[in-house]
């Protein structure tokens, strides 16, 4: 509250889910199982790429976590899309929430109402994504 609080600490190396309640100024940090699936690549595919689910737009894997992916300055059309692994429909994520949400494997197409330039962030372990209009 005064900016003098200590750093967050964890009892052991591993994956954790951090939940923040901004209104109450509280947080919880809960250990979660390490993901077992890893992917060579993750992409977005859909009508937002200017075609009908034909062309993949590749995301870049994070240098510090193999489950975090991003793309900066993606020019997308209004439409819908899904995230998918290894350019295959075997593993894909989606939901019906536009700018942020948690995609489920085999879920609905993600809507995008406006043609724009976006930065996109995706976590293949949780399905969480964020889409940020940048221009």
Which ranges hold each PLM region?
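Bacterial Sec-dependent N-terminal signal peptides
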Residues: 33-36, 135
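Short, low-complexity, Pro/Ser/Thr/Gly-rich segments in the mature regions of secreted, periplasmic
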Residues: 27-29, 127-135
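Structured interaction patches on ligand/partner-binding surfaces of diverse proteins
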Residues: 1-24, 90-126
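Beta-strand-rich extracellular modules
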Residues: 23, 32, 84-88
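Aromatic-rich carbohydrate-binding modules that target alpha-glucans
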Residues: 1-4, 35-78, 86-108
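Active-site lining segments that contact anionic ligands and/or coordinate catalytic metals
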Residues: 78, 117, 129
